[in-house]
């Protein structure tokens, strides 16, 4: 059988106490707050935001500089052996990006007899044994001397894969 025992518990009453307003203020002043760390967190967050903005700006500058480059495709969309465009004009110092558009191996060689006087063809040409084999592979060059430059793809020159760039 279960037995129940009863115990008397006294609960104190606080109804007769008076509060002191000065004590409240001093108690509030002693409460530690985390506001001393907030500026540090804000600075870290601001630096993080600044870093993200800086990276985005740098990426935009890189993309913009690539957008200003002239692109010449090595191989036509229909599979033809051609530079597209085969003739172009650029400003001195402007970047020309030759991009393999097909799966055929191509290169870019400037004809030493068909470039402005004083320009070294070996410094602006790909070595004839080097090839851009896969679609999307690129070769970039900047031509500084004004004049007309004729170029060709050494494996496909006999098939008419030649081009010309005029530097103004």
From Swiss-Prot:
User: Taking every annotated instance into account, which residue ranges of this chain make up the domain Plastocyanin-like?
Assistant: 70-168
Location in or out of the cell: Plastid, Chloroplast thylakoid membrane
Annotated binding of Cu cation, by residue: 106, 153, 156, 161
- Give the family this protein belongs to, as stated in its UniProt record: Belongs to the plastocyanin family.
* Source taxon at top rank: Eukaryota
Topologically, how does it sit relative to the membrane? Peripheral membrane protein
Residues spanning the signal sequence: none
Q: What is the protein's known function?
A: Participates in electron transfer between P700 and the cytochrome b6-f complex in photosystem I.
Q: Which NCBIfam families match?
A: cyanin_plasto (TIGR02656)
- Keyword annotations of the record: Chloroplast, Copper, Electron transport, Membrane, Metal-binding, Plastid, Thylakoid, Transit peptide, Transport
Q: Which organism is it from?
A: Pisum sativum (Garden pea)
Protein name as catalogued: Plastocyanin, chloroplastic
Q: Which cofactor does it need?
A: Cu(2+)
UniProt GO MF annotations: copper ion binding; electron transporter, transferring electrons from cytochrome b6/f complex of photosystem II activity
Instruction: Outline where the chain's transit peptide begins and ends.
Output: 1-69
